């Protein structure tokens, strides 16, 4: 309050009633959008021409006592060039908009998306799994007078200091950010990070590869993040 005297404003894209559909196309969560036809295991309630945000990767990871486990599948249909939420599939039950259980299921799906994007993909995979080894290798392998090492040295040192802080403040230990803010204890967070590092492929960040692999090449909806 001392630094920022006004609360953050809600982006206009997220003021619509169908927040899940807006996030699926106009936020970093669009990274998880895919055609339901690409799912290896597709629940009966999910049609092949649907689009999904599949967070079943959290299945099998127990939540902390008193917490509900994040996860589920956001199911969206293409209608008149836009995505609209059909429901959230969770633990064998399809929760439709307007049903008493839909809001809870949607929140748990959003919790899963947020946990995966921040703790697993951003911090563990990118900061620690990719950027840190690149910085260390560049510093250790190239000679001190190499032009590339000299050019990158200030950025690499800042990267290593920052990622050291990421590891200790956000991931390592039971009092770290990932274990206190989100739904899983430290041991479970470590197990999820191991799986995320083993399964991630950096090629998925290439737009052409990603749209083909996720069945989005001919998607009948506008995908601003991929276009950008």
Predicted regions and their residues:
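Long, compositionally biased charged/polar stretches
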Residues: 1-228
